[in-house]
């Protein structure tokens, strides 16, 4: 979802090669470039174009919420809710989400202090809710860029830990900037 890439880039830039400005990772489907930024690390992900889903019947029961629109990206469903409060207060049925044919389910709405807010549910992957899902923002930013008619977007993922991201939508890529912090440092001894 981007965590491992961001953490790897943070480790590379801060401990393995402090003079480096960028590193390229080979992901499942494409390369992901990580670049040092003034305010964190920018991951350049392939743009994910939303495809509108017309049958909304399974989404309202799974989310216990009124659903405005549903889209499908490469991996995830994306559900548009009424407002930030609907996203923040959502209490989903993870069993119904787990039965869906996708990696995960994103809920989103226009933000009050940022351009858009979201949450990402992925019980199919063993993670009921992810704190900050970089890969989901390739779809989210592409969608909201079209709604707001701008390419430079601020985002907040409303998980318990809250993730703040900056997204820049380009022709074929979405640049997502976030921050990483050193949590633990140690030595591993292998015998």
Descriptions of predicted regions:
Residues 1-191:
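Active-site proximal loop and beta-alpha junction motif in alpha/beta enzyme cores
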């Amino acid at each position: 979802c981007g965590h491992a890439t961001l953490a790897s880039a943070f480790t590379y830039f801060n401990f393995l090669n402090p003079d480096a400005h960028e590193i390229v990772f080979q992901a499942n489907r494409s390369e992901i470039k990580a670049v040092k930024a003034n305010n964190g690390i920018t991951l350049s992900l392939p743009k994910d174009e939303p495809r509108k889903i017309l049958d909304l019947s399974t989404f309202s029961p799974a989310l216990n919420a009124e659903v405005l629109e549903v889209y499908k990206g490469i991996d995830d469903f994306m559900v548009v809710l009424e407002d930030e409060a609907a996203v923040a207060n959502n209490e989903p049925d993870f069993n119904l989400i787990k039965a869906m044919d996708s990696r995960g389910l994103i809920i989103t709405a226009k933000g009050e202090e940022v351009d858009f807010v979201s949450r990402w549910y992925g019980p199919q992957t063993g993670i009921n809710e992810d704190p900050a899902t970089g890969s989901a923002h390739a779809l989210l930013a592409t969608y909201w860029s079209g709604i707001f008619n701008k390419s430079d977007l601020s985002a907040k993922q409303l998980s318990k830990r809250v993730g703040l991201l900056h997204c820049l939508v380009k022709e074929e890529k979405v640049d997502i900037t976030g921050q990483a912090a050193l949590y633990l440092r140690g030595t591993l001894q292998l015998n």
